[in-house]
Amino acid sequence: MESLDFIKAEMITHVPINTHIEPKRVITINGGKRVQRELDKYEFIEEVVHLDEMGAVEGLKNLGPKKFDVAIVYTNLYTNNREFWIELTKLLDEKGVVAVSMSNIFTQKEEAKEELKLAGSIYPIVMPYRYERGVESKKLISEYLMLASRFYHPTADINLQRADLTDGYAYYNSDIAIAAFATPTFIYKEYLGIIKR
């Protein structure tokens, strides 16, 4: 399979950064150099804390009273882990935004529903969004991320100027960011009350 890893790194980073009005403090889990490279495109980010995938729940607990604007979770290891979501949410400010890897809403429906329900029990806005993972047998393979937000909406509150005028994107732009949240009617109906717009 031809890898398009840079697309996931851009979509999991720039969607939440450009949803939040003033993201200054960011926490990443399993993002490493991929996410840091994307965050380096923004001069206004003042602090980035990286946690490893293994032991992330304990790592969150050990951060103390810090507050973050954006959380980027590059793994889906914790997407259906209530303790993880609770500890992560404690570290976000009242308008915090989370982007996290999740199950595919077409091919892993039961898992995706459980993940969305869990996040939706904590956040008023919970929406899956698509990105292209790679090319396999000349077919484009799509996967999903989730944006969970306490206040900002990813399509209504997107900072268009920041999304389109920041240098260095290979894939991401405001049109892609908005279109990534589009879902077919039959999927929207199946996830009615679970996807929280």
Regions of interest found by a model, annotated:
Residues K138-R197:
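SAM/dcSAM-binding transferase cores
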Residues I86, E111-R133, M146-A148:
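Conserved Class I S-adenosyl-L-methionine
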Residues L60-I72:
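A short acidic, Gly/Pro-enriched loop at the edge of an enzyme's catalytic core
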Residues S103-A119, K139-L140:
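Conserved class I S-adenosyl-L-methionine
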Residues D69, V73-N76, S101:
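Residues lining the SAM
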Residues K95-S103:
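Conserved beta-strand signature within the Rossmann-like core of class I S-adenosyl-L-methionine
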Residues N81-G96, G120:
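A short glycine-rich, Lys/Arg-flanked "PGG" loop and its adjoining helix->strand segment in the class I
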Residues M1-I45, G55-G59:
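Class I S-adenosylmethionine
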